[in-house]
Amino acid sequence: MARITVEDALKVAGNRFALVLLAVQRSKQLLRGARPLTNVRNNREIVAALREIADNKVYFSHPEYLMGAKEDFKLIADDTTEFIGDEDYVE
């Protein structure tokens, strides 16, 4: 997927969390047989959804729900934390 498509869609969606929600929802609609709103040229559904978002053809019906979504995040693990799959299994 083209980076420019994601960056353009991000400008329209407002933040990356809203973009993910909107892109997934539209991708599912396309997978179920919805008619694409842009020329998809054999692109996968997620790319078509991002292009539609970037072209302002797809948007949230209730954008006020996203007003509380923040871009702030923090890491929940430090360098000493083990990750799932790192442990040795003993039988």
UniProtKB/Swiss-Prot annotation:
Subunit structure: The RNAP catalytic core consists of 2 alpha, 1 beta, 1 beta' and 1 omega subunit. When a sigma factor is associated with the core the holoenzyme is formed, which can initiate transcription.
Keyword list, A-Z: DNA-directed RNA polymerase, Nucleotidyltransferase, Transcription, Transferase
Gene Ontology terms describing biological process: DNA-templated transcription
A Pfam family the protein falls into: RNA_pol_Rpb6
Record protein name field: DNA-directed RNA polymerase subunit omega
Enzyme Commission (EC) number: 2.7.7.6
Gene Ontology, cellular component aspect: DNA-directed RNA polymerase complex
Enzyme class name: transferase
GO molecular function (one): DNA binding
Family statement drawn from the similarity comment of this UniProt entry: Belongs to the RNA polymerase subunit omega family.
Statement: the UniProt record of this protein carries the keyword Transcription: yes
Domain of life: Bacteria
Reactions catalysed according to its record: RNA(n) + a ribonucleoside 5'-triphosphate = RNA(n+1) + diphosphate
PANTHER family per the UniProt record, alphabetical: DNA-DIRECTED RNA POLYMERASE SUBUNIT OMEGA
Function: Promotes RNA polymerase assembly. Latches the N- and C-terminal regions of the beta' subunit thereby facilitating its interaction with the beta and alpha subunits.
Database matches in InterPro entries: DNA-dir_RNA_pol_omega (IPR003716), Pol_omega/Rpo6/RPB6 (IPR006110), RPB6/omega-like_sf (IPR036161)
